[in-house]
Amino acid sequence: MERKWALLLFLGMVTLVSCGLREKHVQKLVALIPNDTVRSILKAVVHKAAKTQFGCPAYEGYCNNHCQDIKRKDGECHGFKCKCAKD
């Protein structure tokens, strides 16, 4: 039962992340899970998923929107990661 609950939570979090929520929002949801191995695994998975930015190659303008949102700079896709312009 615990595995099914963890899988359901994981899939829900992946869905939320793909909708444009940032890692900090999803980590707040992870904090609601009791402190155990499942929680630490979910935290690591959410962190890795947030770093890869799967929308980068799939959606035109994704990185520009992402970089404007977090740094107020232009951005471009580089592999599976967004690169924001430097000063």
UniProtKB/Swiss-Prot annotation:
The keyword Endoplasmic reticulum does not apply. Disulfide bonds join C56-C77, C63-C82, C67-C84. Its main location: secreted. One of its GO terms (molecular function) is toxin activity. GO terms for cellular component: extracellular region. It comes from the Eukaryota. Residues 20-27 form a propeptide. Pfam families: Scorpion_toxin_alpha-beta. Residues 1-19 form the signal peptide. Residues 53-87 form the BetaSPN-type CS-alpha/beta domain. Coiled coil: none annotated. Keywords: Disulfide bond, Ion channel impairing toxin, Neurotoxin, Potassium channel impairing toxin, Secreted, Signal, Toxin. It is found in: Secreted. Expressed by the venom gland. Belongs to the long chain scorpion toxin family. Class 1 subfamily. Inhibits voltage-gated potassium channel. This is Potassium channel toxin Ttr-beta-KTx.
